[in-house]
Amino acid sequence: MANELEQLVLKKAQSWLDGHYDEATKKQVKYLMDNDMKELVESFYKDLEFGTGGLRGIMGVGSNRMNVYTVGAATQGLSNYLKKNFAGERVRVAVAHDSRNNSRMFAERVADIFASNGFQVFLFDALRPTPELSFAIRELKCHSGVVVTASHNPKEYNGYKAYWTDGAQVTEPHDKNIIAEVAKITDVDMIETGKNPENITILDEKFDEIYLNKVHELSLSPESVKKHHDMKIVYSPMHGAGVRLVPASLKKFGFTNVIMVKEQAVIDGDFPTVESPNPEERKTMAMAIDLAAKEGADLVLATDPDSDRIGVALRNKKGEYVLLNGNQTLVLLLSYQLTRWAERGELDGNQYVVKTIVTSQMANAVAEHFKVKCYDCLTGFKYIAKIIRENEGKAKYIGGGEESFGYLAGDYVRDKDAVSACSLAAEAAAWAMDTMGLTLDEWLQALYVKYGFYREGLVSVVRKGKEGAELIQKMMVDFRANPPKAILGSEVVKINDFQTLETLDVKTGAKTAIEQDRSNVLQWFTADGTAVSVRPSGTEPKIKFYFGVKAPLASVADFDKTLAELDAKIEGIKKDLKLE
């Protein structure tokens, strides 16, 4: 079997040596053929899959790697679909990229192919936040767009995300149709290149101003910022695309004391100061938190390399910096927006917010308090964008997000936006201090007293290879056939199955329809308010378990004790479900 695979791989590699590929690529392929069969197999044993979100993979030569040829095939396939879909129109597209190695080269390749296909292309002059690409598609009335990024993946990776006319990532039926067109590009000679460079328009800082002005329209408390303009804010762009625009946005909001983490303000696709540029991880935030402690900063903000995810750390009463999880950041931003909209008399029953089904139920409680509709959708910002699209002209979107550190305020962008989220987090801190004399950490605890203390946890069970994929599938089949009757002693009263799109009332046996997109996700809800969601990852060999528990918080004085109890409860649930 191994020999058979090696023969196929060698044949495929030889086709690269014989085909119209550049000499440097051929040289690398030849080197692997002669010296590293293992790496050659990894690089050629399959084609890098254009999935529902686009491409993501390790950079290198070969059909299973991110390189100008695989990026080229994806772009030609997308171009062919755009021509079919918008026949008779001059197709307009926007192209952006992050700080990763080769991102500029890939973005220029994408722009060249689009231009060679006769499209009007808007290419940013340098790296930009992903949300600005989404904004550009809408602002410049484009039919599509591409951003070259692998978000917060390790440095070896790069990726390619495709967007549609509304500035959101492509969804059905377009995603499947684009995948089919990309699959038809079987030869490098099918890719159009080197024509019509005049079709490319470069976007520069003038366009940034249009975007930043739109972000600034989200401001809700300019008076509070005036009083606390010199609040110390430490910011890290994690060597990425937020480096210019996040500080520029904070300045536009009125903040005058933003301290950059200098070492992480260097644009570098190797991300030399972090293992992985993911603001979800405390060790990634360590440099920013250390600087904040040294400076006595009130707030720590960070963005991932394409500046769509936000990391937030707050100083507590003991002077320690507490790293918020994505649920806490979402609850704070949502509470701030809804409180200010209510105080300004702007809530009239025609507004709504959105969260994903695995994001904290506390967001639902906050929305309910303000009599604002809260939609729950599948994991992924494209589903939040879909709800915004469906409500256009009917109701007003305020904000929303997901537990994985993504938030979007306002509907002028259709993907998560850490530029606006950073500015709103800073403004919320100024407002809380100005109106209540509270830090954001203290206000979050006050919200727990008001709505209940919600606490979340996550476990990822990794099962690699073909066997692993089968095991994950079997786990889901078993969970459907034999769901737990109780979790940590509390009876399971409701089950949501997003595969069958049914909710089961366990006591009565009654089933009701779930109005949602279909997905392989299960949720169990217990009598004591615990929620457990089970979801196999769409992109990695893992199955994720999301836990949500809650308890009343009588007063802030009980915070530490209740926190310990809730964390212990989450650990107990993991053991009960045999995940530990």
Where are these regions (language model features)?
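Short acidic, glycine/serine/threonine-rich loops at helix termini
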Residues: R104-R109, S134-R138, E156-A162, A183, ...
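Phosphate-binding and adjacent anionic-ligand microenvironments
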Residues: A293, A297-L299, E320, R340-R535, ...
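Gly/Ser/Thr-enriched, mixed-charge loops and adjacent short helices
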Residues: W16-H20, M37-F44, L48, N158-T284, ...
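N-terminal small/polar loop signature for handling phosphorylated ligands or for N-terminal nucleophile
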Residues: A94-Y157, T256-G311
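An N-terminal, well-structured beta->alpha segment
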Residues: N3-V110, T201-I233, A241
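Conserved phosphate/anionic-ligand binding catalytic regions in large, soluble enzymes, centered on
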Residues: F44-N64, A150-N153, P237-S249, P305, ...
